[in-house]
Amino acid sequence: MTIVKVATKNIIKIKPIDEGFEKYFGNVLCDVYDVKSEVPAQPINEEVFQGAENRIEKLKQIVKKGEYDYLVGCEDGLINLCGKWFGVQVITIEAQNGKKSTGISPGYPIPEEYVRKIVNSSVDDVVDDLFEDKGGIKYLTKNEVTKVDLVKNATVMALTRILNNDIW
């Protein structure tokens, strides 16, 4: 059995992280911890990646080496690429041997006129206000993609380096 310690109690993130690991490792036990990211409530750019890293570092203060196979930190936020804003999920995984890998979900565009509102609250709050609590990315993609999908994609992307340690 693969033991994964996850630095979130957000149920929307736990299930897809578990599913991402199960896809490659079979039987997985995910233990969850309420660990703070130490970044702003709505992280931007490097803060998104730092939040995932910080969660792992905080988790290492709680769990002992040998009690896990992998540690997982997750954070969602905004990133600016080439002058355009995107909402993303970031997953960082650290193996027991210390090897780390970070994956990122597909990014969905955030209109410039909403960036300031989002920075002052969150993507979820702004989207829920705009679309009357209909589910954020699920609503924007006409039920094609959910936050669960984004977290699972980021998890699988982070696992690429872990799974291919000898060549990647």
Predicted regions and their residues:
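N-terminal polybasic phosphate/anion-binding patch
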Residues: 2-68
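Anionic-ligand binding patches
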Residues: 42-168
